[in-house]
Amino acid sequence: MNARIAELLHNYLGRPPSLSEYHMLKLQHRNIQKIIAFNKDIFISLIKKNKKKFFSDIDLTSSEIKTSVLSYFSKQRDTYSIGKLYTIIELQTILVSTYTDVLGVLTLKGPDMFPSSTRYDIKSIKQIATSALHAMNVAVLSDKVMGRHNVSPLVSNVNALMEEYLRRHNKNCICYGSYSLHLLNPEVKYGDIDILQTNSRTFLIDLAFLIKFITGSNVILLKVPYLKNYMVLKDKDDNHIIDSFNIRQETMQVIPKVLIDNIYIVDPALQLMSMFKMFSQIDRLEDLARNPEKLTVRLATLMEYVRVKYGVILNGESNHMPMKGVLDKDKRIIVMDTSGYNFSFKKCFVYMDESSLSSDILDLNADDAVDFENVSNSAYLVKGDVLYTYFSNTILLSDPDTIHEISNKAMSAHILIYQILTGNDIRQPLSDLVNSLMYNEKVLIHEVIPRDKKTGKHGIIDIEKDIITH
């Protein structure tokens, strides 16, 4: 045994390391040095300040917070499982290396904020949005309640923290969804705050510890296999606190953004395309049937932004939009005719199974596919005059052989997402797609073609049980 490392492990474990502990943990000696040297008093002070600023309604006392922190940093002394020791060291290392910069900084005075004057009045466009959604309100309601509706009482506290976090970390964290639209139009109501960031795992682990230390309750982090790079933080009752998608820095750089009140939001034109896509998912149409007013305000806000920014004239002239698709049910591939626009491709092969697209890209011997991760939920490849891509939602049919207009619009929007993220001009097709929302009759759904089935196990980080499976 190296005497210096053995002494370090003895100090950390509160006991002489066994031979097995020494050999398994000796390579962790640098992390253990950081943990031992970490100033717990300053850390406890930051936790208390975070509590005062964002969780003042929680009753835990300063003494209880201190006890909770010190207890966790000595947890290894009563742990003999090598696997659990590895977990404790990993999580403690994340805390001592990142907490101050990620969440501790939120307690300091921030930079001056320059309130945005960008606000949108939707009165003139709300009737168009109402009519558009009325035509799309064609789902038959089921009794199934999606997990996203089970909301933790901690959400309002975390939202306050997230607003500050988005301002301080706006180079690597941006928001989308209802909160971003609330910044444009206060009429939009929001629940939790939807975010994309480049350090999602670290942020959520730090936040999980903050909640644990100031509430005294355990929280867990789940990684869902059918959503790429997605993690959700849940409380002890399995209620949703916050979720986050992780993206690469390269993806972050190509996302068009708008700065509002020192917070970057995903450009609403891109969000409108995502909303078009969303409506092809049958459970989202059920949401529309349950609460049309909520979606009306959101759609109207997005449409008004696009109308103003892109000079869209709302006259119902939709030209080639939505682009038409033909479904091969056996191959689960839709061929979209894109020849009406000046794209770099004349048609688009839309795959309903991601593995089939990946296989065909390999067969094409192409190495220039682009993947925008959760922003598009698909890779794209242009080869010859064909765009190859994957569509992750259900496809609706209006009769046995005809794709419903809702799904044609969704796939058209998916194609425009590629055009937006690759920096191409989208003014004409965007104008046409928005105008295709006007003057539509309600057409019932004949059949729902199911989306790609993703398999895999949920990953979990459980601080209380010293478990990391992702």
From Swiss-Prot:
Q: What GO molecular function annotation could you give as one example from this UniProt entry? A: ATP binding
- Swiss-Prot/TrEMBL GO biological process terms: mRNA processing
The UniProt entry, under CDD domains, shows:
polyA_pol_Pox
EC assignment: 2.7.7.19
**Entry annotation: catalytic residues:** 192, 194
* Reaction equations catalysed: RNA(n) + ATP = RNA(n)-3'-adenine ribonucleotide + diphosphate
The residue ranges crossing the membrane are: none
Q: Which keywords does this Swiss-Prot/TrEMBL entry list?
A: ATP-binding, mRNA processing, Nucleotide-binding, Transcription, Transferase
- In which domain of life is the source organism classified? Viruses
Give, as one word, the top-level EC class.
Answer: transferase
Q: What does this protein do?
A: Polymerase that creates the 3'-poly(A) tail of mRNA's.
Subunit info here reads: Heterodimer of a large (catalytic) subunit and a small (regulatory) subunit.
Q: Which family does it belong to?
A: Belongs to the poxviridae poly(A) polymerase catalytic subunit family.
Q: What is this protein called?
A: Poly(A) polymerase catalytic subunit
